[in-house]
């Protein structure tokens, strides 16, 4: 976690991650007088996704980056089923941002049922190379919604410290090691490989 003063603290667990952890984080944020809290939905099972949003977080702003074939054992085999599972986190009477294109119509319908404003986001082409353009565009859109000027948001993004498990590339002699531990599905893996291959001039090998 990162508190309002920018101090980082490890989450120490005795077992697997649990959505109840967010209760303690909410209490800590309230005690520090936080005006905004950014938190990832930890749940993958649809009923727990619903509980995390409706019973614990009750977020005003939701962000669904994309819909990919991930956690198919609990979220469904099709993109439509996975989209429906993710939409359990859509905030009632709130705002939903997404860079997803294929399932955007389905998300918009979910948002409409919950009186939630739907904001599709597309990269403008001038996003800095901090992350994938869609992710940066989403962050900038949410910042703008909260009244943060684009220049201020970009200045803050330029100073952030990357997660040690974030995508990275390391050259080892004549070989290359790609740290892709944060990639969870085949579609994302292929997209990342194509991006890195084009950026660094990598070649496919048998």
List the predicted regions and their residue ranges:
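Short, conserved loop/helix-junction motifs that constitute active-site signature segments
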Residues: 53-59, 88-93, 200-203
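Active-site beta-alpha connecting loops in nucleotide-dependent enzymes
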Residues: 102-103, 181-206
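ATP-dependent carboxylate-amine ligase catalytic core
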Residues: 1-62, 66, 70-83
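Short glycine/threonine-rich catalytic loop with a Thr-x-Gly-x-Asp
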Residues: 127-138, 162-166, 182
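Conserved catalytic-core segment of NTP-binding enzymes
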Residues: 61-120, 189
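Gly/charged, well-structured mid-domain segments that form the phosphate/adenylate-handling core
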Residues: 143-183
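A conserved, hydrophobic alpha-helical segment in the catalytic core
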Residues: 56-66, 130-158
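Beta-strand->loop->alpha-helix junctions that form or flank phosphate-binding loops
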Residues: 116-130, 152-159, 168
């Amino acid at each position: 976690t990162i508190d309002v003063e920018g101090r980082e603290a490890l989450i120490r667990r005795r077992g697997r991650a649990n959505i109840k952890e967010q209760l303690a984080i909410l209490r800590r944020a309230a005690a520090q007088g936080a005006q905004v809290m950014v938190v990832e939905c930890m749940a993958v099972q649809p009923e727990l996704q619903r509980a995390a949003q409706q019973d614990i977080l009750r977020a005003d702003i939701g962000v669904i980056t994309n819909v990919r074939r991930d956690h198919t054992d609990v979220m469904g085999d099709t993109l439509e089923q996975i989209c429906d599972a993710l939409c359990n986190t859509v905030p009632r009477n709130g705002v939903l941002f997404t860079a997803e294109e294929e399932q955007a119509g389905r998300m918009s319908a979910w948002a409409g049922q919950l009186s939630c404003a739907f904001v599709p986001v597309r990269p403008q082409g001038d996003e800095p190379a901090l992350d994938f353009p869609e992710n940066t565009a989403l962050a900038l859109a949410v910042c703008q919604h909260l009244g943060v000027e684009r220049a201020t948001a970009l200045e803050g993004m330029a100073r952030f410290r990357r997660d040690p498990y974030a995508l990275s590339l390391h050259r080892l002699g004549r070989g290359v090691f790609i740290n892709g531990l944060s990639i969870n599905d085949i579609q994302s893996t292929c997209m990342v490989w194509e991006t890195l291959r084009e950026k660094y001039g990598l070649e496919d090998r048998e």
